[in-house]
Amino acid sequence: MMSGSNSGRPALVLVAHGTRSPRGVELVAALAEEVAASVGPTRVAFVDVLGPSPSEVLRELDAPAVVIPAFLASGYHVHTDVPREVADSGNADVHVTPALGPDPVLAAVLLHRLREAGWQSGDAVVLAAAGSSDPRALTDVRRAAAMLAELTGDRVEIGYVATGEPRVPDVVARVRDESGRRVFVASYLLAHGLFHSRLADAGADGVAEPLGVHAELVRLLVSRYRAGVEAVRVTAGAGAAPRHRRRVLPVR
């Protein structure tokens, strides 16, 4: 998929995990469309489940690109899959931004989704993350929970949906037993899919929607892209870069 028409600027390649859920795929496509309205040519690639892969998209472009890993924590996909895909593409002019999360913007979107689900001040919150075996990703999830806790004014517990312990249903049950309060699940997932569907059986009083297409998330993506474009310009001014070089930009 390609959207936008500002061909004079580097293309944006939004890299997501991938899902068999048609609703999830449509959501990622809709997010790309919203971003494209501000930045121009935007492509979507997936590292798992379905294609096209990042390397396929970057080979097709054969032009400067800014790659944004649309992951909420920096685990295996961010540290291993994305760099490998960039190298395999043979595209010499690719700038890779940090992963989307954790970020205060995402915490604000999580709070909005919780309120949509019926959460009120005083209700307990469990942050539901996919999970990872990478300690760096788990650290990112803890940071995300701390950011959300600053906004709710209360502790936010963490539960995992796919990898790691404790599992979301166990955390929900423990928090309810200990506090006697209503418990809501904040879905720390980008889109609908298998992981989000599991949250319906978590036993919570309410489950928030995934981050999805939200104006603040779109603005965050646009900001990351523009930081990447500035890096492209700086590199171009300094001369050509070696082939297969991957540049990781600082978090803005």
PLM region spans:
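Active-site-proximal alpha-helix that buttresses catalytic centers in soluble enzyme cores
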Residues: 1-252
